[in-house]
Amino acid sequence: MLPLTMTVLILLLLPTGQAAPKDGVTRPDSEVQHQLLPNPFQPGQEQLGLLQSYLKGLGRTEVQLEHLSREQVLLYLFALHDYDQSGQLDGLELLSMLTAALAPGAANSPTTNPVILIVDKVLETQDLNGDGLMTPAELINFPGVALRHVEPGEPLAPSPQEPQAVGRQSLLAKSPLRQETQEAPGPREEAKGQVEARRESLDPVQEPGGQAEADGDVPGPRGEAEGQAEAKGDAPGPRGEAGGQAEAEGDAPGPRGEAGGQAEAEGDAPGPRGEAGGQAEARENGEEAKELPGETLESKNTQNDFEVHIVQVENDEI
């Protein structure tokens, strides 16, 4: 009974022992796999030769691969493996390209494909926006290559935005529109100029002179009365006939002669109108002008005196 039990146990444990994993040289760890398969997108003559040999194996004889640069080779590979023509390579397209270039024999066993680690490494280092897709710019620009030749103590080159900003400020300073806005007076200066102009216009020395000039140019009630008197003297009427009779009679004394003499004497002698005219001339020459209400009262009094004198002359002629 015991040998039978031992035989059954041996038969049950034998397949399990043969199927258990074993250590061997045919199964390297992940670190060894990563070292054996470098990133072909990294700059270097060895990686470039690897990609060129892959393209030669494809039979692309229309392109001279020896004269292509690294950027041109990568763009050529990108165009070959962008199957959906989206302008981006996803993980499967990267896996297909790297498997065909690095390990063609591992394409039939995806579970043991060592290129998967390379795809993960490429997406980790070169996928800058982290969307899981590779653009041509991300494929060509390997991170850390541009700063490799720069020493730590060496200052970096200034950004191109700084000279543009300086040039823009100089153009703004030289622009005629900015100069006009700088030269144009502001609202405070205009208001200040208006206040000074009003002060000059309200100067008490200049205001009477301006009123005197206005009085001299604009005909007032005195000028209208004198014009009416001249018109009456020229037009034929009872006064004109009386004046003609007075001249015909000569120097004979009479009431009409006395009236004509008085009229001529009033023409020669200064009267109220002459005094008013002298006052107006004195105002125009620079004397101090009187206030406007007093001047209007004086003109009214002069007009009344002139009308009374005309009535007296008519009564004398009649």
From Swiss-Prot:
Post-translational modification: Probably digested extracellularly by an unknown serine protease generating extremely hydrophobic bioactive peptides.
Induction: By p53/TP53.
InterPro entries membership: EF-hand-dom_pair (IPR011992), EF_Hand_1_Ca_BS (IPR018247), EF_hand_dom (IPR002048), ER-Golgi_Adhesion_Reg (IPR052110)
Signal sequence interval, chain numbering: 1-19
Residue numbers spanned by region 4 X 17 AA approximate tandem repeats of P-G-P-R-G-E-A-G-G-Q-A-E-A-[KR]-G-D-A: 219-286
Binding site for Ca(2+) 1: D82, D84, S86, Q88, E93
Compartments reported by the entry: Secreted
Basic and acidic residues bias locations: 186-202, 223-233, 281-293
GO MF term list: calcium ion binding
Sequence repeats: 219-235, 236-252, 253-269, 270-286
Region (Disordered): 177-318
GO CC, alphabetical: extracellular region
Membrane-spanning parts: none
Binding site for Ca(2+) 2: D127, N129, D131, E138
Domain EF-hand stretches: 69-104, 114-149
GO BP, sorted A to Z: cell adhesion; negative regulation of cell population proliferation; regulation of cell cycle
Chief site of localization: secreted
Biased composition, class Low complexity, residue ranges: 235-272
Domain commentary: Both EF-hands are required for function.
Job of this protein: Mediates cell-cell adhesion in a calcium-dependent manner. Able to inhibit growth in several cell lines.
Stated name of the protein: Cell growth regulator with EF hand domain protein 1
